[in-house]
Amino acid sequence: MNEDIFVEDIRGWKEFLDSVGEVAKPHLDSTKITKLIYSAAIAFCCYIDLTKDGDQKTPGTFFEYLIGHLFAKRLGINPTKQLDVLDLDIQATLPTDFIFNLGKEKPKFHLPVKTSSRERVIQVWAHQRVLDGVYGTGRFIGTPVILGETKSDKRKKEVIEICLPDQWRIYQMHIAQLKRIYYLDVPAAYNKLNEVFPRIAVRPFGDFFREVDALAQ
């Protein structure tokens, strides 16, 4: 848990939820939004760590539902998790991460959700590549949301960040283009990807609620 961004008093959570779906955009600033969501997510993860030994699935499922709910509330639509594949011979569907369809002649949001990018993050770019290949580049906006990259080293009794920025640059150049990568706890190594080629837009998740309308244009 990152104490610098953890908020014990989350009375602002209700204010955020009440305003998140408004067209006028949430009243809270991006930094406070990110801290509130981080606190809600990491508190649950800590509880599971303390009460259930080795349970990694439950925190991941909770985080997926939390982020999917906030996306849906902001966009005003519910997601799907499969898409019809155009095929001349068979009817087939493609299982996906959350897909938010904004309507005719508008882009769709492709939302992978992960507690860390160590969970086979290359699949995020691979799924985006499939969507681009099947439906056309630009139809789906790739916007993964990740909790953080910290891991406890029990031997050294310290918390470390595990990041692979050079691999991300290769994925972005040679597999597919992700529009944004949102974090609740932005790693310094990935934040630097905003400044090098190919630029990967790594942002605090709170930014999404203010910039989503521009992204959807």
Segment roles from a protein language model:
Residues 1-75:
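Interdomain/boundary linker segments immediately adjacent to catalytic/signaling cores
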Residues 56-57, 87-89, 110-117:
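Short, surface-exposed loop/turn motifs that are enriched in glycine and acidic residues
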Residues 57-58, 80-83, 132, 203-206, ...:
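Intrinsically disordered, low-complexity Ser/Thr/Pro/Gly-rich regulatory segments
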Residues 58, 62, 66, 93, ...:
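Short, well-structured alpha-helical interface segments that form or flank functional binding sites
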Residues 73-92, 98-101:
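A short acidic/basic microdomain associated with nuclease active sites
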Residues 99-109:
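Active-site beta-strand-loop-beta-strand hairpin of nuclease catalytic cores
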Residues 112-168:
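Catalytic cores of nucleic-acid endonucleases
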Residues 147-217:
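Domain-level recognition of nuclease-like catalytic cores that cleave nucleotide substrates
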